[in-house]
Amino acid sequence: MILPITIYSDEVLRRKAKPLKGIDTSHEELIGNMIESMRNASGIGLAAPQIGLSMRLLIVDLSPVQGYENAEPMVVINPHILAVKGYNAMEEGCLSIPDIHADVVRPSSIQLKYRNEHFEERVDEFSALMARVLQHEIDHLDGTLFVDKLQRRDRRKVQKSLEDIAAGKVHTTYPVAEINQGAKAS
């Protein structure tokens, strides 16, 4: 089932998401719906707050990106970045902030502790695009948006567009949730 994407200015995007204590069949169904919703919106990452849920769950699927066509969707639960290395700038966008793109500086590689879709604990290292997408989605779990990381002059360039989105002036090819609907129970 395709779920509506929560848009900039909705309060759930600004809250620190709650950790999951385990997963059951309802979470498995949610994960499937998140993957379907992300693909429908032509995204490569989606965090639970982006569908209105305050839980530390995210999905990454780089398969639409050239060079990553064989990548499988990755489920990340309760992530915690243990270490970072190197920094680089790269253009980012966000399904919750349609039509805005800007360069964001992030670590180029990370060591991540998380639980997978079977709730098994993992510690893995990620670099390049995967590291960037994971950090972007983890930011969502912490109530941070990529526009919060912009330098002042870059933020000024997108401010009017952000105000338009907050006012409901949003045009997407995917369904969006009503703004300020609040967080749903997890």
From Swiss-Prot:
GO terms for biological process: co-translational protein modification; translation. SUPFAM superfamilies: Peptide deformylase. This is Peptide deformylase. The active site is at E137. Its EC number is 3.5.1.88. The gene is def. It comes from Prosthecochloris aestuarii (strain DSM 271 / SK 413). It catalyses: N-terminal N-formyl-L-methionyl-[peptide] + H2O = N-terminal L-methionyl-[peptide] + formate. Binds 1 Fe(2+) ion.
